[in-house]
């Protein structure tokens, strides 16, 4: 079922609350002060039922200029607008301001309602309609229906209900794919139930039992119960007004303007990159560095507006800007906002968030402007490539992209395949992507790094993988680093072993003397069997003039894995260890455990040397010590290959 929020807007005392009551039977003025003063101070909500069984939620917002903050808190989730104009007064200051706010918040459809028509004659109504048409020209309400109503006589109420029903049928359906998010506009507690928050669910769906988080502080909680218009429900979907009973958190820990969201789906930010607009009828110039009041959802923040491509934003103009906030805010790309002048407090503009987690920008940076232009109006493919590119060597997974883009996974997979075929993206591992430009940059760095390494260590088989990961990718996740190196290997640029990487065209070249030393070292270590040989003993086999060459060849043999360090300085020939591996494997085919004594007897060595060998296997993860015995370790499968 489609869920639609209808927002009432208009000047104070123009009959919004009475109109809601006539449509729904609900008096949305709930506060004693509202009853006493006869004006709406805070938000009111009502359910509007239609004959076909469908329904919509109506948000009644205050019309008095002193309560614009409350009006903004309720307007954030509005799909359709009812602009209310009293027939006996016409357009008034808050009518204009409310219309500006709805326009800034991206509301795209609605209608205009003339109230109190019983107080004026037909000629006046005709003139008023013409005036209203001229006032809404150029806005989303241009050419929209204008309906005449009177709560006192009942005129036009049913026609209005039918018109609203028709609008809801054509309203755009919200996506339930993105993680749920509910900006909180009320928080209170009820005896026996605990903490309750209310708001409009603007993304995703939330269910009883869900784990949730309150931003910007990050406090954890759980959804105990849900209500929509006073009725218990098991789940709430985007576009519905809801009351959420929370467990695990006190009312005092929550403020109006906080956001209830899926755990770890949002991160607060102190900066926002935006497209900022100064209203055409604004009386203010927004200069770079100006302080403004930012209204986002139900939250209010002080913000410093840094204009990125000019010094001042005049009425009717728009530009890219960075808003630097006084307090952290939880937002998402594509969210709308409103800004009001710092003092005096008046609505001057608003816009759309392009990046909720930007770096701090310098002004007049052409690359930043170009990047923001893609975020604002680029194609879906361009936005996807930019999103992946901004993650650099981390890249993005399909799951990452699904969280960022409100698209079905099937469409994302199709777009990714096209972009890979065009050479814009590279799938470095299943469902993990980097931009081609990022991969090219990484290869340039990798080639430079390995060329230098081969020049300095010509007898090494290559750079150790752990060192290559650290130097090339500066501590990125091992899985990602390995995927990038493996990608280079698939392209024929690298050779990879379990321990090393080298340029594909690199090979170790030994002199005749180095080759002779190599053979002697291998023969000696092979003859020593599992006892091995100390490095200084191996170097002592040669004349002093060959000591330096011996050290180089030893280093080469260790890098290629032909010799292995059983313990510091103690070298064992690889085929000897392979034979011991075979014994260990055979032992555990018939035994569950291995003791030091059993291994000593199998090797025919001393107890101390047997312990060295066991500790070597422990370090590799081949074996795992449990008290006085060993069992197969996490890497035992290595010796089965």
Regions found by a protein language model. Give the residues of each.
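C-terminal effector modules of nucleic-acid-centric enzymes and ribosome-associated factors
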Residues: 8, 120-124, 134, 249-565, ...
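Conserved catalytic-core segments of large NTP-driven translation/proteostasis enzymes
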Residues: 117, 123, 134-282
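Conserved nucleotide-binding/hydrolysis micro-motifs of P-loop NTPases
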Residues: 64-65, 88-92, 107, 116-121, ...
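Conserved Switch II/interswitch segment of TRAFAC-class P-loop GTPases
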Residues: 55, 61-66, 76-127
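Conserved G1/Walker A P-loop phosphate-binding module
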Residues: 1-61, 65
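Residue-level signature of catalytic and energy-coupling elements of molecular machines
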Residues: 13, 19, 38, 60, ...
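Residue-level recognition of beta-strand microenvironments
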Residues: 11, 187, 204, 226, ...
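Small-residue-enriched segments and motifs
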Residues: 6, 56, 144, 182-185, ...
């Amino acid at each position: 079922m489609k869920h639609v929020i209808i927002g009432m807007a208009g000047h104070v005392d123009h009959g919004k609350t009475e109109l809601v009551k006539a449509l729904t039977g609900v008096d949305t003025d709930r506060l004693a002060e509202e009853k006493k003063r006869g004006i709406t101070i805070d938000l009111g909500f009502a359910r509007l039922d239609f004959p076909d069984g469908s329904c919509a939620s109506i948000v009644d917002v205050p019309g008095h200029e002193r309560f614009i903050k409350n009006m903004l808190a309720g307007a954030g989730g509005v799909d359709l607008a009812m602009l209310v104009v009293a027939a006996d007064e016409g357009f008034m200051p808050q009518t204009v301001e409310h219309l500006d706010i709805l326009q800034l918040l991206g509301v795209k459809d609605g209608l205009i309602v003339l109230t109190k028509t019983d107080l004026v004659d037909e000629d006046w109504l005709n003139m008023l309609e013409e005036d209203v048409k001229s006032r809404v020209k150029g806005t989303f309400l241009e050419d929209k229906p204008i309906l005449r109503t009177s709560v006192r006589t009942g005129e036009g109420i049913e026609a209005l209900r039918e018109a609203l029903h028709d609008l809801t049928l054509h309203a755009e359906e919200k996506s339930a794919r993105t993680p749920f998010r509910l900006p909180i506009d009320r928080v209170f507690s009820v005896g026996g139930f605990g903490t309750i928050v209310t708001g409009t669910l603007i993304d995703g769906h939330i269910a009883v039992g869900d784990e949730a988080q309150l931003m910007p502080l990050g406090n954890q909680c759980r959804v105990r119960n849900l209500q929509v218009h006073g009725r218990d429900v098991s789940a709430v979907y985007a576009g519905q007004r809801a009351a959420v009973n929370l467990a695990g958190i006190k009312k005092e820990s929550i403020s109006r303007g906080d956001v209830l969201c899926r755990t770890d789906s949002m991160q607060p930010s102190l900066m926002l990159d935006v497209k900022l607009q100064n209203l055409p009828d604004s009386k203010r110039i927004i200069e770079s560095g100006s302080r403004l009041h930012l209204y986002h959802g139900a939250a209010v923040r002080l913000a410093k507006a840094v204009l990125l491509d000019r010094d001042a934003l005049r009425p009717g103009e728009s530009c890219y800007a960075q808003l630097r906030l006084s307090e952290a805010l939880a937002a998402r790309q594509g969210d709308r906002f409103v800004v009001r002048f710092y003092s005096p407090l008046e609505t001057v503009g608003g816009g759309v968030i392009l990046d909720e987690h930007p770096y701090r920008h310098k002004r007049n940076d052409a690359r930043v402007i170009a990047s923001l232009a893609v975020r604002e109006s680029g194609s879906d493919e361009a936005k996807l490539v930019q999103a992946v590119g901004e993650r650099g060597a981390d890249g993005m997974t399909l799951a990452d992209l699904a969280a960022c883009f409100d698209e079905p996974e099937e469409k994302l997979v199709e777009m990714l395949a096209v972009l890979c075929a065009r050479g814009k993206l590279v799938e470095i591992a299943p469902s993990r992507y980097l931009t081609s430009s990022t991969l090219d940059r990484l290869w340039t760095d990798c080639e430079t790094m390995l060329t230098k390494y081969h020049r300095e260590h010509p007898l090494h088989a290559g750079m150790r993988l752990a060192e290559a990961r650290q130097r090339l990718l500066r501590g990125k996740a091992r899985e990602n680093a390995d995927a990038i190196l493996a990608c280079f290997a698939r392209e024929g640029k690298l050779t990879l072993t379990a321990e090393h990487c080298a340029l594909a065209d690199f090979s170790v070249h030994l002199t005749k003397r180095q080759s002779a030393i190599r053979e002697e070292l291998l023969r000696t270590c092979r003859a020593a069997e599992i006892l091995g040989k100390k490095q200084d003993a191996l170097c002592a086999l040669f004349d002093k003039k060959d000591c330096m060459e011996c050290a180089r060849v030893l280093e080469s043999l260790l890098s290629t894995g032909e010799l292995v360090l059983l313990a510091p300085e103690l070298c064992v020939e690889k085929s000897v260890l392979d034979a011991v591996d075979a014994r260990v494997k055979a032992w555990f085919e018939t035994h569950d455990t291995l003791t030091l004594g059993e291994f000593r007897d199998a090797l025919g060595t001393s107890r101390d040397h047997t312990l060295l060998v066991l500790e070597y296997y422990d370090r590799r993860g081949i074996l795992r010590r449990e008290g006085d015995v060993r069992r197969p370790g996490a890497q035992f499968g290595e010796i089965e290959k």
